[in-house]
Amino acid sequence: MERTELNAQPVVLDVDGSVGTLPGELRLPLQDWQEQVRFGCGLRRFAQFRAALDAQLPAAHGTALMGSGDFHHLSWPLIERCITAQALSAGRPLRVVVLDNHPDNMRFPWGVHCGSWVRRVALHPAVSHVHVAGITSGDIGRAHAWENYLTPLRAGRLSYWSAGVDTGWARRLGVDSAFRSFASVADLSRTLARMLREQAQPTYLSIDKDVFAPEVVRTNWDQGRMLESEAMDIIGALSGQIVGSDITGDVSSWRYATWWKRWMSAGDGQDTQIGAQ
């Protein structure tokens, strides 16, 4: 099951101008969509963006770079495109591995946003399981338990891999089997890498740079504690299995014109004004 996706032409979804020039890149000019889709949007607007993306994106490409973590929900259409391109199905499903400091499975009643997209992917019939790994955020702690979508956790379609977070509430709600808790990110990474190596299957890898410790890279979201070597061990364990991938988490600033985006992004502790003029 050898794959060459990581060596194919990288594609930049250039919505916010934060991704530097890459050798051999394909860059899609999508800046006109920034206010509309950044952080989140309604499903109708997202469908319009997806149509614009489909019109420009080739069927085959390498890793997609999406800029700020505010655009992590763009992984949803990319994963569905991957499923179609690879002719995957319930009989031959896709596994999704997300390296992220947040679960991205939080309630959002107005459509989809960067913190809610995982639920939609996990419940796709051609996706066997989503593993969100590297979580040190309080988003899966007791105070925010009510914000997590429980359906994919209860259905056995989604697992949280975390370190240093009290997730005792999961046992009380009967979803503790979906939680893999570790004393350290190092233990988490070793265990995940071993599982991925032993249970090979077509895999989509999505990396949000906020999973990394601040000494590795700086983002404008609260960050985790993963080291570069630990991420590389996980990627190495997926050798020959990756059929699609994306990276998000670059730093960019944006002054939202939409009131609820200003309110929600501030409530999430995000700094959207880094370097803003």
PLM regions: where:
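Conserved alpha-helical scaffold segments that buttress catalytic/binding sites
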Residues: 2-277
